[in-house]
Amino acid sequence: MIQKNSRLVVADNSGAKEVLVIGILGGTRRRYANIGDVVVVAVKSGSGGTVKKHDVLKGVIVRSKSGIRHENGSYIKFYDNALVLLKEDLSIIGTRIFGPVVRELGKKFSKIVSLAQLVL
């Protein structure tokens, strides 16, 4: 579960390395976000690219330490919390996705699943 003030790793090549969650979209009193949810983030560190430090963007969570339950009953947990940065129209900024993602993302964000190195 990701909440406000959580720091996440960026899993694409947009130029940002680490972000801070400043809002969770989808309700007025929403406290937690899971895999597939859209959050508002502030860039905390980066390597210079499309995205600069202190930019405020949207992102979709692709990996979480708390994990996700598949339809067949199995659970998948990851070693880090990661997200992919999005533009205002919810299209991805980067052109590559690093690390594994879950196949449940394909329902809303099929582009992320098609660019991912490994789909679980």
Swiss-Prot record:
Keyword terms of this UniProt record: Ribonucleoprotein, Ribosomal protein, RNA-binding, rRNA-binding
InterPro entries (alphabetical): Ribosomal_uL14 (IPR000218), Ribosomal_uL14_bac-type (IPR005745), Ribosomal_uL14_CS (IPR019972), Ribosomal_uL14_sf (IPR036853)
Gene Ontology molecular function: any one: structural constituent of ribosome
GO BP terms in the entry: translation
Keyword RNA-binding set for record: yes
Role this protein plays: Binds to 23S rRNA. Forms part of two intersubunit bridges in the 70S ribosome.
PANTHER family referenced in this protein's UniProt entry, alphabetically: 50S/60S RIBOSOMAL PROTEIN L14/L23, LARGE RIBOSOMAL SUBUNIT PROTEIN UL14M
Full protein name: Large ribosomal subunit protein uL14
Gene source species: Phytoplasma australiense
